[in-house]
Amino acid sequence: MHAWPDPSVPVVAGTPVPLKLFDTADQRVKEVDTTPDANGEVGMYVCGITPYDSTHLGHAATYLTFDLAQRQLLANGHKVHYAQNITDVDDPLFERAERDGVDWRELGTSQINLFRSDMEILSVIPPRDYIGAMESVDEVIAMVQQLLDAGAAYELDQGDIYASIDATEQFGYESNLDRATMEEYFAERGGDPDREGKRDPLDALIWRGHREGEPAWDSPFGPGRPGWHVECSAIATNRLGSHFAIQGGGSDLAFPHHEFSAAHAEAALKVERMAGHYVHAGMIALDGVKMSKSLGNLVFVHKLSEAGHDPSAIRLAVFAGHYREDRDFSDAILAEAEERLTRWREQLAGEVSEAEATEVVDKLRAILADDLNTPEALSLLDGAAGDCNQIIATALDGLLGVRI
C-alpha cells in the first residue's frame, strides 16, 4: 500500500546531539540505540490507524511525535527505516460499516485516503513501509505457526488460536502494570477475558476462526483472519528485524497492544526484547475534555486546513505541550500558535551573525534531543533576534517541520 508524498526535509546545520527518549519499559529517559540493523538503518515502527472513522487531531499528535523523532535522527545523519501498519481488517471496521450501511472495504479505503491527506497537510515524513493487515496475512500465518510450534499458542473451538502470556518470562516488562490493572485494561481495550476455555484470562487472540459474514483467509490451521496484536508483531519484525530501535504509538497502546505485540514476536523469534525503546504519546483533549465522537468534540486536521489555518501553526499548537503529557487543544491555543508563527517570521527577517544563528541551532538540537522537549524549544525560538542565510529557518523546517 502506498503512503503519501514525502515532504522536502532540509539538511540541518550545527552539531548532532544523540537522541534520548523516555522508554516506557525502563521508565527512564535514555539514549536511542542507533546501532545500524541488518539493513544498516535505525528501525522505527509506529502503530497505524484502524480506518473506521475520520482521524482527528489526537491521532495526528501521535504521528507528529514520531515525525519529530525521525527528524532528529535524520538531522544526526542516520538512515531511518520507518514502518507503519493499517488495521484494515478488524471488528470496529465491520461494526461501523454495518451501522452505516456501507461496504467495509469502501469505508476503510475512504478513511485511509483521508488519513494520507491529513499527514501530507502536516508535512509528516511517510513510512517507507505502509502495510495493511490484508497485505500481511501470510506473514501473520507464519508467525502464528511459529507460536504453535513453540508451544506458545493453543487452539480453542471455532478455530480461534490464543497466545499464552507465560510463553515468555518477561511478559509485563513493557507496560510495567500490575495484574489487576492489566485485567482492567484488557477488558476495556478489545480483550476477551471471559472467553471460555482460555488458559489465562489475559491470553490474547492471534487468529480468529472464520465466522459467517466475515472475511477469511486459508491457513494450515483453518480459515480465519489475524488478531490485532500479532499483526503488528509480524509486520514490524519482517521489515525491521527481530530487534529494532523504537516501537511507538499513543499511551493507550502501551497495554495491551504493545505488551502483546512484543510478547508474540519475542516468543516466536526467541529474542529477549523486540524494541530498544517503547515510546508513547499522551492523549489530546479539547477544552479539557477528551476527544470523542460520542461527545461531538473531535477536531479534524482537514477541517482546520480548509478553514485557512497554516499547517505550521497546527504543528506549533501540538508542540506547545510535551509529547508525553495528556494535553489540551483549543481555539485559543491554535490562535497563540498562529501569533507565535507570525512573530517568528518577523523576528527571523532580521539579521544576526552566522555564529549567533548557529548557536541558536545548536541549542535547539540539544533541547529536542532531550526527549523532544518542544515547549523549551519554542521558548528558545521566541527569543531569536534574527537569522543569517536562513540557518535558523532551515533548522526549524528540518527539526520541527515548521516552515518560516
Curated annotation (Swiss-Prot):
The keyword Transcription does not apply. It is an enzyme of class 6 (ligase). A motif ('ERGGDP' region) lies at residues 188-193. InterPro entries: Cys-tRNA/MSH_ligase, Mycothiol_ligase_MshC, Rossmann-like_a/b/a_fold, tRNA-synt_1_cat_dom, tRNAsynth_Ia_anticodon-bd. Zn(2+) binds at residues 47, 232, 257. L-cysteinyl-5'-AMP binds at residues 47-50, 62, 85-87, 228, 250-252, 284. A motif ('KMSKS' region) lies at residues 290-294. Monomer. This is L-cysteine:1D-myo-inositol 2-amino-2-deoxy-alpha-D-glucopyranoside ligase 1.
